Design a protein with these regions (language model features):
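Beta-propeller blade termini and top-face loops
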Residues: 1-226
Length: 226
């Protein structure tokens, strides 16, 4: 199965695909890492991260197609180490893990600021499946921000306005026209849609509709139009 597709803006012949769906329902299908095409999908080359199993998002630098970020969720049914945010600076020839929480929590979403690609937001999800249920939420879930291309990260999970208590799955997006505006769809007892007008420093809940978050393992995506 396919969890993420990213086309390089600077060269649309270059496409990265992350395998394994991040919507880990009962019949989830895992993948075998990241694949790359340099001829618009005619042929493909395997470029690694085979034990990441579920890949939720891939982001490519808008001006340099060799700079790639991968949100790897990891194994569905148990702990493993190949999870978190990975970065390549050579088109997938090698990968470096730049953000990690634990062997039970992985990166499920990534947002890149269209006006400043060195600014990134990463969502982590602490989750695992059992044959009869999904355990969603835990100490590894959270929201993180980097302003230096993923080299360092700040935990913004408990910034003013975001929900307290156990956090589950998170979707994150940045306005393409105003870098200060960020939205997050958060699974939590007091979750919902949250908006920041100051780059994630403070937040306001804009929608508490339970239908948006009650079955987070099926879908937790949010996209900014403006």
């Amino acid at each position: 199965s396919i969890g993420a597709i990213a086309i390089a803006e600077s060269n649309p012949d270059i496409v990265y695909v992350g395998t394994g769906e991040e919507d880990i329902r009962g019949n989830v299908t895992h993948g075998d890492g990241v694949w790359k095409s340099t001829d618009a999908g005619k042929t493909w080359t395997y470029v690694g991260l085979g034990d990441s199993r579920q890949i939720g998002r891939i982001r490519v630098h808008p001006k340099n197609p060799d700079v790639v970020y991968v949100a790897a969720l990891g194994h569905t049914w148990g702990p493993n180490s190949e999870r978190g945010v990975f970065k390549s600076e050579n088109g997938g020839k090698s990968w470096r893990r730049v953000l990690y929480q634990s062997d039970s929590a992985g990166a499920v979403d990534l947002a890149m600021d269209a006006n400043d690609p060195s600014t990134l937001y990463a969502a982590f999800w602490h989750a695992y499946r059992q044959p009869w249920k999904l355990v969603s939420g835990g100490s590894g879930s959270g929201l993180f921000k980097s302003t230096d291309g993923g080299e360092t990260w700040k935990n913004i999970t408990r910034n003013p306005g975001l929900p307290a208590g156990v956090i589950g799955k998170i979707g994150i997006t940045v306005s393409p026209v105003n870098s200060k505006k960020v939205w997050a769809l958060i699974e939590a007892d007091s979750g919902g849609v949250f908006r920041s007008d100051d780059g994630g420093a403070t937040w306001t809940k804009t929608n508490s509709e339970r239908n948006l978050r009650q079955r987070a393992w099926y879908y937790t995506r949010i996209y900014a139009d403006t």
